[in-house]
Amino acid sequence: RDLHSFPTRRSSDLNGGMDARTKVQVGPEYRPITSEYLDYDEVLDKYDKMMDWLARVYVRTLNVIHYMHDKYYYEAAEMALIDTDVRRTFATGIAGFSHVVDSLSAIKYAKVKTVRDENGVVVDFETEGDFPRYGNDDDRADEIAVWLLKTFMAQDRKSTRLNSSHHGM
């Protein structure tokens, strides 16, 4: 599974940084959510903290990738042909964005019950009721999407970029 996938992060947030499938600690360890039904504010607090950690890991990983591109000459020949000041950009992205918006929307506007394994690890969810979904022109879901994007970008911008690149998404 993709460590940088937002839905994967959401799952490990609920389990105190542990991956539900592998039972391996994949993020910072902290107290898992133990309630039967998910509370929006509690989930958002843990998700925000996990996103902050994830943004740092993500940028460090991309810095290594960009450094290796520079080191092994992938773009050096092309860059030599540019006769002006180069404005470097550093693009990041959010895998699973709509899934997380929908998940947070379900927690906020419906009732989401956790399904746990024999060890108490959240492995699934049961949603009772309806909730606004991303991409359906509903301001309630859009507000969650805007919060998610702004929050992640603010956390993302805290990290130093290779070659003083400009932030992008």
Task: List each model region and its residues.
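Single conserved hydrophobic/aromatic residue that forms the stacking wall/gate
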Residues: 2-8, 158, 162-169
